[in-house]
Amino acid sequence: MRMPFLSLGIGAAVLLGGSTVGQVVKPLPASPQLVEKGKQTYQLHCAPCHGAAGQGDGPAAYLLYPKPRNFVKAQYRLVSTWEQVPTDEDLFGAISRGMPGSAMPSWPSLPEEVRWGLVHYIKSLADHPLEYGQPTQPPAEGGTGTGVIEVPPEPVYDEATQQRAAELFVQGCAGCHGANGKGDGQTRQIDSDGYPTRPRDLTRGIYKGDPSPESVYRRIVAGLPGTPMPMSDWAPGADAWALTQYVLAMSSPRQRQRSEMLKFAIETPRVTKLPSHPDDGEWRTASPINLHLMPLWWRDDRIEEVTVRALHDGKELAVLLEWHDETHDHTALRPQDYRDAAAVQFALAPDPPFFGMGSPGQSVNIWMWKSDRQADLVAFQELEEAYPNMGIDSYPNTLRSPLEQPMRHALTLESDPSFVTGWGAGNIVSDPTRKNAAEDLQAQGQGTLKAHPRFDQEVVAEGVYQSNSYHVVFRRTFKPKGKEGVVLKPGATVPVAFAVWDGSHGDRDGKKSVTIWQELKLAP
């Protein structure tokens, strides 16, 4: 078995749940108790995307691409049978590993019993039984077999096999995946539901299903139902194995592992002095953890990882986020411009709600930093930055022209807050006296985001962009003033998740890249 590459920084880190690639699992038979347990878990963690009735129409579905699976239609992509129907093991594997290349996260941290309960509950939503026959081999003259596709022993991948595989790839795969496997062949495609789809770039190592050779073999033979990827015409055996080995050679195990969402324990040492700036030397005492990110609206050209460090002094927590970004999007002066941003999300209970901004009745506390808010604190961001040759009107009866303002809110500060609606109402964004690029927020699911009152805004954040990378520090006291913030204490373990926005790719609001829940372990 291949040992998975774990994306860690220097120092110790604990992987929770672990990778599921190639693991053999023992199915649990359905029972009323197990199905009920699956139903409860489904309503908490799955319904926000897949919908309460499993029709792929949950409240978060509009934010996601590819779209969530419709469990009622029961047309599954990852199958290992000639009938193109998933086995229980297929469904268990998809739940455990997630589906890289989509917003379907991995759930290896859920107990196996709970995941089997999900398998049986999801099957109960289908409008037809998921049935397949006893295993039989396809006839010698061609055609298909029945039941689970038998995988013969893997042969040696020698030069002759590689040449044969290259010929097969050109004949049957390059038309969609491109001559070099970059997904640049026939790109105008739709799935069975009428949604746009595109061929996989095989060189990036982003596999929806288990990338083990046996699983890839079965997908080459069975295809991906509901997509333009058909059941293969190649004879099972040598040709299918040659294609499997050829395709897997286009990417590395490290690439394939980096597309999986993994759960880590983020150790948070106790120090006497907390760093206040991203470049402070105290950060050397914190072990970096590289967390994998997934875009909710998937794109291959994505920010793959965010590196997290955390420290505390017994009274206050400091978190450092670092990620690579080729563009410094720190202004949003034009309608087509979007800013870069980052956020830290805390669950308020040990058993966290849905990782996508919480659930009704189960709040999450969000600390958010925005690059344009930080730029505003440094200098007045005027339209002339975007349009350097624009003409500007200046009127003698005004106190100052825009270019003569000593700071962004100079004119606003001379006004009565009663007549500046946002400021007067306590909107933290409209406050001209604001000296912080952070916002302390609360949410109970999609569409519920709100800011804490101005007097409860205690989170401080500062970001630096250098060498095509962001470095952002968040700080807040352990005990918040208000009742809605996360309460921290030495020795506690707190569920935490992270998000990054890339303005140059149109990220804004719910269009972002996120992690799954991690564990923040505060040293005593």
Predicted features along the sequence, with ranges:
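Periplasmic/extracellular electron-transfer cofactor-ligation site
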Residues: 33, 39-66, 101-103, 125-131, ...
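Short, well-ordered beta-strand segments enriched in hydrophobic/aromatic residues
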Residues: 316-323, 470-478
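Electrostatic cytochrome c docking/interface patches
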Residues: 21-41, 132-169, 254-258
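Beta-strand-rich interaction surfaces with strong enrichment in secreted/lumenal proteins
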Residues: 306-309, 459-465
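Acidic/polar low-complexity flexible segments
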Residues: 256-281, 335-435, 481-524
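Extracytoplasmic electron-transfer domains, predominantly the class I c-type cytochrome c fold
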Residues: 63-108, 115-125, 189-247, 339
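Bacterial N-terminal signal peptides
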Residues: 7-17
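Short amphipathic, basic-aromatic surface patches that mediate peripheral association
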Residues: 325-332, 482-484
